[in-house]
């Protein structure tokens, strides 16, 4: 008898804000797919159900991200402390406001308990 694998349905992560689960890579200020169209599946470790397909970027995309980050960092350094503080506070507020969804994504992707994932999200927000 030969075992046959059954196709696993794509897992739908029930987010309040589905726009938080982006199936692209953020490079140089924009969401992009791989230049060659390659991607790989992110799966739920519990049952292997696919959650998302994300770009499999190559060396050129990594170099571009590094080059742009180095340039943007110079702009960041020229901002006043007050400006940087305002931007970081806004980022912090967004993380806290979306902590439940971010924790659900983390739980689905890594298999950790939801309460632990939410604590991780909020703990990391505190670093900002």
Predicted regions and their residues:
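Terminal low-complexity tails and localization/encapsulation signals of metabolic enzymes
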Residues: 1-53, 86, 90
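Glycine-rich loop-to-alpha-helix module at the N-terminal edge of alpha/beta enzyme cores
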Residues: 49-128
């Amino acid at each position: 008898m030969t075992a046959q694998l059954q196709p696993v349905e794509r897992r739908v992560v029930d987010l309040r804000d589905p726009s938080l689960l982006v199936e692209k890579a953020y490079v140089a200020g924009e969401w992009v797919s791989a230049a060659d169209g390659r991607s790989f599946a992110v799966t739920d470790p519990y049952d292997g159900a696919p959650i998302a397909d994300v770009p499999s970027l190559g060396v050129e995309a990594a170099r571009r991200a590094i080059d742009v980050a180095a340039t943007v960092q110079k702009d960041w350094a020229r901002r006043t402390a007050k400006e940087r503080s305002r931007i970081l506070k806004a980022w912090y507020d967004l993380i806290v406001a979306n902590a439940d969804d971010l924790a659900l994504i983390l739980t689905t992707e890594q298999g950790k308990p939801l309460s632990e994932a939410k604590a991780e999200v909020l703990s990391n927000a505190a670093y900002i």
